[in-house]
Amino acid sequence: MKKIFLIFALFLYKPLLAEDLEITKWFNQESQQFLEIMNDTSVDKSDFNKYEKFVEQNFALKSIAYGLINEKVIEGNDQETLLKYQKAFKKYLIKTIDNLANTSVSGDIILKDIDLKDKVYIINSNIKDGKSSISLYWKVVKINNDYKIIDVIVENTSYFVTKKSEFTKILRKNRGNLKKLIEILEKF
């Protein structure tokens, strides 16, 4: 009976272990790529190709973009305006990463642990440069067998929560006018 229980337990545990190894491998690969992009001094800062590729490959762009605005705003706009918003948000995110690169992120990203809650991986890591350490959490989901970042939390400050608050304020000030938000994002 014990053997059957152990075999059954191992059978259930094996997929979880494989998933842990897969997300760990993804994180190590993408965090290394992130640091390489950030520390590449040969990259022309006006050329967003590397940043754009990284963002497209690793961020759940549509989910984040739509999550940052009220559902009524989404429902109140046509597809053309929503697509324009998605494109403006993508460029805004790329420029945000470019600005981060200009602050010269260096060191190593160290994986501390990974938790899974409600199908969202919460990856706890630190960026260490020898002198200091910055706490960095990544919220990641699996979409169509690809891992996608839905939020980055730096020193307990969520990018998603911060931007949602900013976008809500802009939309409220402009009576829910998504075109005005797009205009502001494009000026960034």
PLM regions with names:
Residues 4-13:
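Sec-dependent N-terminal signal peptides
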